[in-house]
């Protein structure tokens, strides 16, 4: 390539300085790696069904899925496809019944609704199919709506919670069972740590549990017994830390092995946490999205909290 550029420069009029400058410029363009980050603003003007987005997922093809107040949108980078949800021949009202999008081990997109309807995307027919109607499967007093859900992509099941009960849905067999459990209060957030261990959070307490053959066994962690309005929990595998967001007292970190509870100073007091995810740039950091206060970066080793 450089030889071709040199030959091209030689055919120019005899001006040595101009030849040299052109050669240098073209060479720099070719050998310098181009590093660019592309951002695209997506809104209702180019196809998004609503500006109120409840959940976002990226599938194995790279398509983006959005759960909004108006339904489910898939964006392939060029255009949107809108999907409706139908149960028993009736079109479901999207808000406030919708809850979250999840992706299983096979890369299939699921929609888990607060009304107990579980939908699975059928790529062959390009539509969402109802695979579980919670109210029909559980004839007892189920206590709907669902208050929390967690799709475990490793074990291919979905942990579901109602007002005072917990259930397990098998993604492969579509079997729904009520778990034997001593927990009789409303669970609002779920995080999985290692093996069959789950953390279940109510508004003021976090339960450490082990799933064992249809039973939830509570493992006592007194350090997790008293919080002021838990609004999010997230388990970070690399550091073995449970990140706890509370509305009144801010952010806490809990080491599940040493059982040390750490209060993160200046940790977002009186701010609601919407989501916590692992950072792709640093394995010891998480990103915390808030409701109205922006995004923060938290180092789980130094406990340093900074604006992102």
Residue ranges and their predicted role:
Residues 1-308:
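Carboxylate-rich, polar loop motifs that coordinate divalent cations or form catalytic acidic clusters
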């Amino acid at each position: 390539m450089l030889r071709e550029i040199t030959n091209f420069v030689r055919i120019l009029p005899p001006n040595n300085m101009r030849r040299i400058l052109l050669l240098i410029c073209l060479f720099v363009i070719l050998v310098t790696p181009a590093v660019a980050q592309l951002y695209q603003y997506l809104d209702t003007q180019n196809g998004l069904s609503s500006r109120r987005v409840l959940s976002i997922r990226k599938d194995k093809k790279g398509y983006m899925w959005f759960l909004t107040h108006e339904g489910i949108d898939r964006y392939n980078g060029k255009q949107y496809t809108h999907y409706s949800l139908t149960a028993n021949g009736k079109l479901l009202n999207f808000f406030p019944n919708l809850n979250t999008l999840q992706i299983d081990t096979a890369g299939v997109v699921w929609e888990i609704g607060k009304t107990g309807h579980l939908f699975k995307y059928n790529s062959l027919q390009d539509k969402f199919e109802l695979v579980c109607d919670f109210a029909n499967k559980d004839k007892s007093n189920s206590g709907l709506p669902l208050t929390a859900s967690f799709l475990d992509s490793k074990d291919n099941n979905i942990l579901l919670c109602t007002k005072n009960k917990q259930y397990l849905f098998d993604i492969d067999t579509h079997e729904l069972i009520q778990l034997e459990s001593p927990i009789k209060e409303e669970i609002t957030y779920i995080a999985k740590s290692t093996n069959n261990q789950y953390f279940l959070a109510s508004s003021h307490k976090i339960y450490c549990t082990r799933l064992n053959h249809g039973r939830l066994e509570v493992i006592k962690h007194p350090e997790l017994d008293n919080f002021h309005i838990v609004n999010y929990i997230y388990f970070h595998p690399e550091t073995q830390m449970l990140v706890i967001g509370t509305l009144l007292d801010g952010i806490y970190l809990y080491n599940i092995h040493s059982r040390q509870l750490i209060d993160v100073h200046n940790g977002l007091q009186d701010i609601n946490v919407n989501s916590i995810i692992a950072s792709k740039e640093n394995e010891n950091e998480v990103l915390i999205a808030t409701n109205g206060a922006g995004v923060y970066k938290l180092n789980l080793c130094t406990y340093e909290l900074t604006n992102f």
